[in-house]
Amino acid sequence: MTSVGALIGFGQVRHARSRPRAHAFAYPTFFLMLPMRSLRAQGDGALARNRRAALAFHDRDHGDGRADSLQWLDETLAAQGITDASGEVWLHTYPRVLGYVFKPVSFWYCHAADGALRAVVAEVNNTFGERHCYLLDAPRYGVPATADKVFHVSPFCPVRGEYRFVFLRTQHGAEDRTVARIDFHDEPGAEALIRTSVSGTLEPLTEASARRALWQHPAMTLGVVARIHWQALQLWIKRAPFFRQPAPPADFVTPGHPSPPVSTPL
């Protein structure tokens, strides 16, 4: 990708549950896509970082809460033996809106010096104030990557089974799009219990695009939290199984399963 400035995405969040009763919803959203290494080197005047603004990004909303989230990321990668992700790191995340933030999931796309995707860190938050990360080593765009589910997110989903992640970043002419899909399989061989995705078209973050985002979604953070609880009520009415919150995992980072080897033609 050639752009080194902060981007903003306008798109949709989708969620579908297959059983015991079908349940699905979709709603419009916006998000940030931030080139973290470039921002460290040169900043971006359009991005309010670590300061008050109607739309802002704060490092301490990520990782272990330190002032430099990129430093945390590099240390996390190194602890898992990944020392060659020295290229750009694109962070797909929700901003603070009017001082409030809730980020169900953020994605750190970590590239090698040659631009190849080296790792992805999926940073998950639940409504109980807990956070956990899934680290996918050597994933490939468009190819499923998996990790065991070890972290409680919803009282209507068990902490077992695995996540299957698929990531896409495509450019067609001037259009730059991103897609992140997560399917949750609670039982081996069964269809996915949950299918979720967030997708959008990216454009430069400017004062005009930020105003448009705030005009279209003036209370996005509150809306995200309200929708989570509204959908939980719908599942309770439909008598979806209820699971109590377990203790969080001992380790803050869960490594994903090894990616399948790349097949080469004979």
Predicted regions, residues:
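Mature, function-bearing regions of proteins
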Residues: 1-266
